[in-house]
């Protein structure tokens, strides 16, 4: 069976990734492309500044863009699912209107921390999808909203999940985040050349709060946040794609570096068990070289869906430290 999907915010960087990953997908067919009112009524190829490394599919280029409202989308085609890449400042009410009738999978931050909305990383917390039933009953919707975490949170929690068996207590993370994470046109060249920007608005708070929800337990229809402490510092660096994070963790148990490497290598999630089409064979890849991972060499591992970990060491202050890298607009966004 193939499901028809609408992509909201299709002309942006995340919307383009949705198109790239859903075009020719065995389960989904792109039925409707929606964007802003100024783009509506025009062909996608004329209004989209395509920034990805692959060519824009000709069939997609010829599709007519519609406005991002339920009436316009329904008029353009019959849909089963909605993928939302809308900016967070407008996503909230628009997604809620669609969710009254359709399943909505959102990249925006608008609904991430709502108590009845799953904040989902499929390898980490698939059981949180139980919230969908509660959400539909509470809001009297036929559809629902499931949210996707911040790009820098996703790769972090994928690496933290296998460490929870050792008793996770504290996490300190410092990020070096790629330019594409700021969207297009993004950061001005004069601001980033020969420079590092030591502040990304709202990013640290997202990591600290989202991590607790994702790693929390579903109990009696509510998420009980994980009882760990998370501290984040975020920086924008002059790299096109691929977020690199320095992670320091305190564990309850005394573990060796080899214990941690083995936990990373053996980690599999529900997508791997089900052999889902977009799931990487290995959600975490361990590199042994002293100077890896690096964005240029490692961001496309697992077709951009794997998290690459390296420099795993004992830490003199906490327990273990390591670096992790992931493609921020593939695993991290779409």
Question: What are the functions of these language-model segments?
Answer:
Residues 1-199, 229, 272-276, 283, ...:
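N-terminal Rossmann-like NAD(P) cofactor-binding subdomain of oxidoreductases
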Residues 180-334:
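Charged docking surfaces used in two-component/phosphorelay signaling
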């Amino acid at each position: 069976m193939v499901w028809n999907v609408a992509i909201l915010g299709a002309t942006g960087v995340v919307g383009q990734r949705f198109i790239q990953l859903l075009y020719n997908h065995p389960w989904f067919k792109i039925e409707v492309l929606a964007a802003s009112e100024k783009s509506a009524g025009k062909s996608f190829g004329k209004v989209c500044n395509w920034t990805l490394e692959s060519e824009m599919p000709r069939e997609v280029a010829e599709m007519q863009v519609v406005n991002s409202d339920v009436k316009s989308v329904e008029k353009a085609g019959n849909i089963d699912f909605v993928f939302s890449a809308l900016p967070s400042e407008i996503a909230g009410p628009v997604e809620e209107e669609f969710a009254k009738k359709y399943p909505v999978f959102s990249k925006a931050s608008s609904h991430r921390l709502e108590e009845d909305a799953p904040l989902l990383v499929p390898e980490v917390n698939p059981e949180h999808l139980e919230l969908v039933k509660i959400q539909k009953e509470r809001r009297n919707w036929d559809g629902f909203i499931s949210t996707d975490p911040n790009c820098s949170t996703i790769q972090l929690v994928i690496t933290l999940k296998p460490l929870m068996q050792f008793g996770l207590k504290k996490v300190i993370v410092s990020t070096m985040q790629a330019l594409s994470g700021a969207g297009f046109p993004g950061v001005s060249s004069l601001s980033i050349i020969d420079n590092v920007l030591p502040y990304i608005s709202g990013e640290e708070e997202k990591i600290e709060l989202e991590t607790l929800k994702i790693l929390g337990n579903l109990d009696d229809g509510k998420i009980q946040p994980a009882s760990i402490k998370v501290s984040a510092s975020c920086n924008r660096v002059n790299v096109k794609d691929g977020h690199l994070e320095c992670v320091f963790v305190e564990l309850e148990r005394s573990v060796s570096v080899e214990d941690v490497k083995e936990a990373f290598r053996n980690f599999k999630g529900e997508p791997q068990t089900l052999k889902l089409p977009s799931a990487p064979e290995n959600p975490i890849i361990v590199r042994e070289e002293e100077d890896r991972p690096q964005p240029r060499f490692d961001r496309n591992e697992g077709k951009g869906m794997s998290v690459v970990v390296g420099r795993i060491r004992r830490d003199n202050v906490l327990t273990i430290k390591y670096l992790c890298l992931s493609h921020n607009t593939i695993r991290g966004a779409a």
